UniProtKB/Swiss-Prot annotation:
One Pfam family named in its UniProt record: Alpha-amylase
Gene Ontology biological-process annotations: glycogen biosynthetic process
UniProt lineage: Bacteria, Pseudomonadati, Pseudomonadota, Gammaproteobacteria, Pasteurellales
Reactions catalysed, as given in the entry: Transfers a segment of a (1->4)-alpha-D-glucan chain to a primary hydroxy group in a similar glucan chain
Protein's UniProt name: 1,4-alpha-glucan branching enzyme GlgB
InterPro entries the UniProt entry points to: A-amylase/branching_C, Branching_enzy, GlgB, GlgB_N, GlgB_N_E_set_prok, Glyco_hydro_13_cat_dom, Glyco_hydro_13_N, Glyco_hydro_b
Subunit structure as annotated in this protein's UniProt entry: Monomer.
Amino acid sequence: MKTYTYSKQDLSFIEQLSQAYCKDPFSYLGLHQAGDVSVIRVFLPEATTVKILSAVGQILSEALKIDDSGLFVAQLAQQYSSLNYRLRVGYSLAEIDLEDPYRFTSSLLPMDNWLLAEGTHLRPYEILGAHLKTQEGVSGVHFSVWAPNARRVSVVGDFNYWDGRVNPMRFHAESGIWDIFLPNVEKGALYKFEILDSNGNIRLKSDPYAFASQFRPDTASVVTGLPEKIEVDAKLRHANDPDQPISIYEVHLGSWRRHLENNYWLNYEEIANELIPYVKDMGFTHIELLPITEYPFDGSWGYQPTGLYSPTSRFGSPEDLRTLIRKAHEAGINVILDWVVGHFPTDSHGLTEFDGSHLYEHQDPREGYHQDWNTLIFNYGRHEVFNYLSSNALYWTERFGIDGLRVDAVSSMIYRDYSRKDGEWIPNQYGGRENLEALDFLRRTNRMLKKEGHGAVVIAEESTSFAGITHSPEENGVGFDYKWNMGWMNDTLRYMSLDPIYRQYHHDWMTFGMMYQYSEKFVLPLSHDEVVHGKCSILGKMSGDCWQKFANLRAYYGYMWGYPGKKLLFMGNEFAQGREWNYNESLDWFLLGEQGGGWHKGVLNWVRDLNRTYQKYPALYQLDYDPAGFEWLVVDDWQQSVFAFERKAKNGESVIVVSNFTPVVRHNYRIGVRQDGTYTEILNSDAAYYEGSNVGNYGEIECEAIESHGKPFSIELSIPPLSTIFIACQPKPKEAVEAEQDIVKMAEVAMQKALKPTKKTVSVKAKAHKKAHKNKK
């Protein structure tokens, strides 16, 4: 085959391949029929020679280089409908044997293609992205990506010297997906997609479905296997239920602790070995991780992700993260992931204008640009975008064993006019401000997780009064399991910042939350958002001098742990870190030593005991979302800033919580209670153990049959200054109550008998009356 006659097809593809805009390479490259013979076409720009080998290494043909761009054509002696062949490629310095990617058929099944086009594939991550697989006995990686408006897409990496001309992909017009199987590419290989967009611009993009990514500032995706599914113990998922104690420790992995010698992060293994025992000892039931999906900028704390399917490489591999979660589960601790699906950054390697069009985002900046964060907003109305985001929830719960997702910035998702002035937003189809597509996305995702998530919960960070966030979609709700109670947090922190002298005038700030308490299933959050951007630490928000600040904080935590709703505390708050959180430094653990003067250790001990008491007494959690579980005992003592309420369990057992938000001891303070029994002070924030002044009730408290606050019984307390105390009631046994009732009845009968006049008494009285009447006459 020394001479070659060029066809129109040859000339067309020579131009397309050499100029790197070939959209249909499989129709030309690889094995094809040409009249009575078969030909194999190969495009390798740097090659000097190409030979065709049989499966056993026999040379079947030597290809002719028909164009200097690197196009080779080999004619075979007979026709083949299929052929297991290899390439022996000569380069200037070596000759190597290669598999030809263009001899392999697509592994994208018609049903998958159809479901992906429709946006209804439950697990698109099992198809899209980079998947290690064996095809026709050859191991390699199947790559696929959605880029419907691209003119050409190629996989590039170390395996082809990042040359976009070498491996153009197959285009599926019905779904907009490109795919190719690259033989002999192995786990750990770096890759990107080189996209020729409709405007003729080259874009180098990370894989939206990548399961691993390079460490910043590098941005390539990393070939790794799709993690195996994880079966989570039903007992752990049951711990997410509304009638269970949920106390969440919110953690930023990059700054919880660092290596002292170089201020560098702990890795996933080190975090597991230190964080989990600490959380267990502190009595928290859940860990909430600030976003760990891959993100380019440390200062975003993870809230501007570029790889939703890729755990950040800052702390190790995806398998290392799975190990951390497994160890948490072994310790009986559930793990919640902060999930950012409201926006994404404008980094050029990410989703922005992915194929030259506004593929993942809205084109109009009034819908697609978030001016507060300089980020782009997902187009939830597009089926493929919906599918990309919704399936990600299932990916984390199934493949990593995540027990819950906390959805970030829900308000910015569901309102089209969020943080926008008039004229800066586009109304929905009915002229309203609600983002109907975002609401539909949230409802359908929550419904899907209820069905497929095996007990994983979804929590909304939603800062407005949008109705029905935790109601089911069938009730016209959004379907979340829990919602952060931002209103309660803001009101109570404002109250605690006041000098105690002025608190009496704002008594309702501590009680108003009960007006809407049962409208949603609330979590009480003291999150990272409250200790950044000049807001100061939680300790810094408390009023008073040093002693008062710590006393106020302990009292406030006590009020919070007693109040209905699940609990969330950001790291550092458990020991009253004095300065704002800094993502680039470790927490101030030294404060728990001598430098902290004992104050911080006292708060740490208080939070630990709050958590343990919280888990011990079902009255403090079982009926968080049932009005039967809460009753005000003292709600109107605004002059003394005293609050008292009773928490009740399903079996009727109760715990009374009393708070005094002034620095004045309230001696002989009587509180009405509904039942007789033994009352015991079980927690006191003013105890010396917590660095308080040690005023208290010291054990059992006498219950008296004295009416107070509309109750038949009452107890008299000494309420310490700036404190919260917890009092448990052990009702008298039924037999004792019945015996007392019998004694009372017997006494009443005896009294009635003593007062009833006898016949002799009546006769004497009658005679005396008759004599007195006679004398009067």
